[in-house]
Regions:
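RecB-family 4Fe-4S metal-dependent nuclease core
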Residues: 1-200
């Protein structure tokens, strides 16, 4: 509908103006969109496409993940230090440039930039992690989690994580790994394994 389209255009325009202001205040001199990032980890090669990779006049890099909505969800990911997609992009850029970049989420429908610190973006809404850990430590937790899960798979054990399944010793992550997270069932590719209900 015309009104919906007009509203969408207005919010998108405001979001782009705000992002341009953030970029200007940060002294950004280079912006790359849909930037390919490639690297490796103990399991093999990793590759992805970061929404925005920026560099300021001091040569510091930042990777920004653009989201249409989620002004509560994504700050919470930073608070819980569970921004894994950003952490993976950051590690791949670290492998390329030799230093950890800053990370941030930009939520378009609210024109809000969230970051765990203001190192690159001085006007960002800073959301530090509750436990004091940073993106580099999240990456190390991911590696510990990967090693734990690989050892389970190699021994023929595949965990289905559901709220309705009691926690056991085998389903408890090691202390240096990421805590187990129950994902939204709407995005579960393995619902057939997890079971279903007849809603008719």
């Amino acid at each position: 509908r015309g009104a919906d389209l007009a509203g969408f255009r207005y919010r998108l325009h405001q979001a782009m103006r705000n992002l341009r202001d953030q970029v200007g205040k940060a002294g950004i001199v280079e912006v790359q969109s849909e930037r390919a990032v490639v690297g490796h980890f103990p399991g093999g090669e990793l590759a992805g496409s970061a929404d925005l990779v920026m560099k300021n006049a001091r040569g510091e890099h930042a990777v920004v993940d653009m989201k249409w909505s989620g002004s509560k969800k994504f700050p919470q990911k930073l608070r819980d230090n569970r921004h894994l997609q950003l952490a993976i992009y950051a590690e791949l850029l670290r492998q390329e440039h030799g230093a950890w970049p800053s990370v941030a989420y930009y939520v378009l429908d609210r024109a809000r930039l969230f970051a765990p610190d203001d190192r690159v973006f001085p006007s960002a809404e800073v959301v530090p992690s509750a436990d004091g850990e940073n993106t580099a430590q999240l990456w190390q937790r991911f590696l510990a989690t990967w090693r734990w899960r690989v050892s389970q798979v190699q021994s023929g054990r595949f965990e289905v994580v559901l709220d309705s399944i009691p926690v056991t010793d085998e389903s408890t992550a090691p202390e240096d790994a990421m805590g187990t997270e129950t994902l939204n069932e709407a995005y579960n590719d393995y619902r057939t394994l997890a079971g279903w209900e007849n809603r008719a």
